[in-house]
Amino acid sequence: MKNNYTSLKSPIDEGDESKTGHEIDLEKGLLPEYDSEEEGALPPYSDHARVSNSPNTHRENNPSRSTDNSSPFLIKLLISFTPIYVLNVLAICYLKYKDAFFKNYGAAEWTLFGFWCLVCTLALIFLTYFYETWTKAVKVTAVGLYNSRKKWVVIIWLLWVVICFVLFGCIKFGNLNLDKALICSTCSISAALLLFLLYVRLPFWTLKHMFSGLFQVLGVQSCVVIVTKGLMYLFDKHIDATGYEIEATSLFVIGNFFFFYEMECPGALKRMPKFIRNGIASFLEGIGNAIGRIGNAFRGANDNNNNIPLEETEAESEV
């Protein structure tokens, strides 16, 4: 069976199509009229127009090679020198505090000083050479932290935990006779104040929630301290320095864990007594079930012994 196909194109259309070599694009529509006498007037769908109007040029694809966006060398050098300068200022302050800044330097001290200068020089060269890379990384990190306030809270709190542990070490090796358990509460309050200063732009309900969680954590810590002190007084025992350190460390870890848990799950501390009661009830119920199963096992064994036929017992007695 032959297909009776009749082309709808007229001979004139076929002749024009063979001359131009282009078909009408159904999505773009008909070609608009243009004046060929004007300079640079080209059909908008022509290949040359696509090349000339391409949005991605070589300069836009290579922004690092463009001279407009690049910083001058002196500015790069100054910005790269800033973190090294801050680090050296901190080192000088520490040496001044120890009263060891260029005092009684021997061969080992001068060797260490020369090595430090070499490291700072290499770091400056590295930061200047890879200026675009590390500045872009810093910008991306800063923008990401600013856009995610929840991560800010986590990061600042973890940093403050590290700072508090450093303070514990300084107090441990120093001559400060302080109760380490009270330091935990001080660190918690100072951490909350630090968060408050850094998060002034937070909504009021977030700050209210933060302080509510803080006071609940302090309440838990106070209960633990009172119970511990009461037991020590009851048994007429005193906590030595090691005991204070253990108490302070445990309270600090528990306090930070509860605070972080409360910030992540609002109302968790209020629901904790119910969870504790349910846990104790489940534990006691499990013990009761275990005891009941043991009793059933003994009871079943006694029933099996009582169900032995009388003939078998008589036969065993005759033997």
Curated annotation (Swiss-Prot):
Its membrane topology: Multi-pass membrane protein
Protein origin, superkingdom: Eukaryota
Region listing for Disordered, in residue ranges: 1-22, 35-68
Function: Acts as a suppressor component of the dual wtf meiotic drive system, and can suppress but not confer meiotic drive by compatible poisons. Wtf meiotic drive systems promote unequal transmission of alleles from the parental zygote to progeny spores by encoding a poison and an antidote from the same locus; the poison is trans-acting and forms toxic aggregates in all spores within an ascus, wherease the antidote is spore-specific and targets aggregates for degradation by the vacuole.
Keyword terms of this UniProt record: Membrane, Transmembrane, Transmembrane helix, Vacuole
Cellular compartment(s): Spore membrane; Vacuole membrane
Assembly description: Homomer. Interacts with other proteins that exhibit high sequence similarity.
Name of the protein in its database record: Meiotic drive suppressor wtf16
InterPro entries in the record: WTF (IPR004982)
Gene coding for it: wtf16
